[in-house]
A protein has these predicted regions:
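Membrane-spanning helices that line or support transport/gating and their immediate boundary helices
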Residues: 18-22, 26, 30, 123-130, ...
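Short intracellular "coupling" helices and adjacent cytoplasmic loop segments at the cytosolic face
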Residues: 29, 37-67, 141-164, 239, ...
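An intracellular "coupling" helix at the cytosolic face of ABC transporter transmembrane type-1 domains
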Residues: 48-49, 65-78, 82, 86, ...
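ABC-type nucleotide-binding domain
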Residues: 265-266, 272-529
Length: 529
């Protein structure tokens, strides 16, 4: 018996030390950060549609809390295994060595303990899933208000946003109350079982003593072991609850983080090679919410050709650009660049060969230099400064100063570039495109945020940028694209007219009507119902 006890003692010491090394050197250090990085990397591969259907704050919360929950799961599981091996197994061996009869109440208690856990733990896990989702929604609403703080202030809706966030906090607390009720009932049941265990084992030990089957010291030793086992039972109860609460959090997080990536490179996808820049839309059909937005669309853009796309709101102009960038899958047809189907090439290589300036420019919350070099991270400072001068941004960048005193190219632009004016953001975006120098250029209202004087100054630079490039320009201000090689007029996802500005005016069709309705150079849009 002594040899058995010594062996158990050394085995416990070895197991506890191994568990401690794993917990402190792996789980507490790099493990959660690696998980966050993997989850973040996974989300970055998701399609635009995935992000359009969720809160940015909610997704951030999922990344953070799921990684922590996985870490806590393994830490708690390790602690539970250590305690079970040290106390329960040791106590069972010792009691069995004294008398196998002492194991009877212990086994009955274990069965009742597992039955209680079987009842409460799945319910705690379900509540934890609801709680994790409620926490993510709460975080998403708070983050949404901060991200759009200018809109909140503009409409004087601070109180409304406060109540909106408070409603999600109430929903979160509802799950907390449910969790606490279940936890309390679980604890009460374990305390009752602990009393049953104490009475059962001590009563059995006393009976053995009265029968002359055990010494009086056995009662004292048994009492000490059972009291320790009772404290272990409470420890196990809380840790089992926490374990399955983390399981619920993990399950909830993986419902979001584990979603299938809709737009993926094919296994045999090759990098896109653009030598000329010819673009062909071949019988393209795209549906959104079961409605064809682009319907059997055919367009051949020659290498180096500059075309303008015109149409009322909802005609499908921006959708064409998103399809060209492979943000969505086509329902039918194909899009070819220099004869290569964009669905057969890698997404990164496709977008590396296309430069885009949109009307709603947002910048990263980083320095001016980092935002400009986002177009070509390996660019030199001289290359960057050259692009800045071409974009007519050199006049205001040296004047920029942030709250920490960083100035010029090192100044932080704020979240989405909120510290800059619309025109300044647009010029930095244009500088970024100059630096990227891609063979295909897309201008989606590229100068809409600029005043007439700056627009006139930058137009010559844009003309220089267009040289030897295939250009697609979308504009509501028709005067900015009237000189394009060809104008494409879209209507309900189809080409209604095409030709030069003069040819379309002579046709007296949709384009001519849009031209006539301009006021001061701006198009009065008519939305398609």
């Amino acid at each position: 018996n002594i040899l058995i006890l010594i062996s158990v003692l050394f085995a416990n010491i070895l197991f506890v030390n191994i568990q401690s090394i794993i917990k402190h050197q792996i789980l507490y250090s790099t493990f959660p950060m690696r998980l966050r990085w993997r989850f973040h990397n996974l989300l970055l591969k998701q399609s635009l549609d995935f992000f359009h259907n969720d809160f940015a704050g909610r997704l951030s919360a999922k990344v953070m809390q799921t990684a922590l929950a996985i870490r806590e799961f393994w830490i708690i599981l390790g602690d539970m295994l250590a305690y079970v091996s040290i106390y329960f197994i040791t106590v069972s061996i010792v009691l069995g060595a004294i008398s196998p009869t002492l194991l009877i109440p212990l086994m009955v208690w274990l069965g009742l303990f597992l039955l209680s856990a079987w009842f409460f733990i799945p319910r705690l896990s379900k509540v934890s899933q609801q709680q994790a989702d409620a926490r993510a929604v709460m975080t998403g609403r708070v983050t949404d208000a901060y991200t759009n703080i200018q809109t909140v202030k503009l409409f004087a809706h601070a109180g409304r946003e406060s109540q909106y966030a408070k409603a999600s906090m109430k929903e979160f607390m509802t799950t907390v109350y449910a969790q606490m009720r279940l936890g309390t009932l679980f604890e009460v049941s374990i305390n009752l079982l602990s009393a049953v265990l104490f009475v059962g084992v001590i009563g059995t030990a006393v009976w053995l003593w009265t029968q002359g089957l055990a010494a009086l010291g056995v009662i004292a030793a048994t009492t000490a072991m059972i009291l320790k086992l009772n404290s272990m039972a409470e420890f196990m109860m809380w840790h089992m609850s926490a374990l399955f609460e983390n399981v619920g959090t993990i399950q909830d997080g993986m419902q979001t983080l584990g979603k299938k990536i809709n737009i993926q490179d094919k296994p045999d996808a090759k990098p896109l090679t653009v030598k000329q820049g010819e673009i062909v839309f071949k019988d393209v059909t795209f549906a959104y919410n079961n409605k064809n937005v682009i319907d059997h669309f055919n367009l051949h853009i020659k290498a180096g050709e500059k075309i303008g796309i015109v149409g009322r709101s909802g005609a499908g102009k921006s959708t064409l650009i998103q399809l060209l960038l492979h943000f969505y899958h086509l329902k039918e047809g194909a899009i070819l660049i220099d004869g290569q189907n964009i669905e057969d090439v890698t997404q990164d290589s496709l977008r590396a060969n296309i430069a885009l300036v949109t009307q709603d420019t947002s910048l990263l919350h980083r320095s001016v230099a980092e935002n400009i070099k986002y177009g070509r991270p390996d660019a030199t400072d001289l290359d960057m400064q050259s692009a800045v001068h071409k974009a007519k941004a050199a006049e205001f960048i040296p004047q920029l100063v942030d709250l920490k005193g960083r100035s010029g190219y090192e100044a932080q632009v704020g979240e989405r570039g909120v510290k800059l004016s619309g025109g300044q953001r647009q010029r930095i975006a244009i500088a970024r495109v100059f630096l990227k120098d891609a063979p295909i250029l897309i201008l989606d209202e590229a100068t809409s945020a600029l005043d007439s004087e700056v627009e006139a100054a930058i137009q010559s630079s844009l003309n220089d940028l267009m040289v030897d490039k295939t250009v697609i320009a979308i504009a509501h201000r028709l005067s900015t694209i009237a000189q394009m090689d060809r104008l494409i007029v879209l209507d309900e996802g189809r080409i209604a007219e095409q030709g030069t500005h003069e040819e379309l005016i002579a046709k007296n069709g949709i384009y001519a009507q849009l031209w006539k309705r301009q006021t001061g150079g701006f198009l009065i849009e008519q939305k398609v119902v």
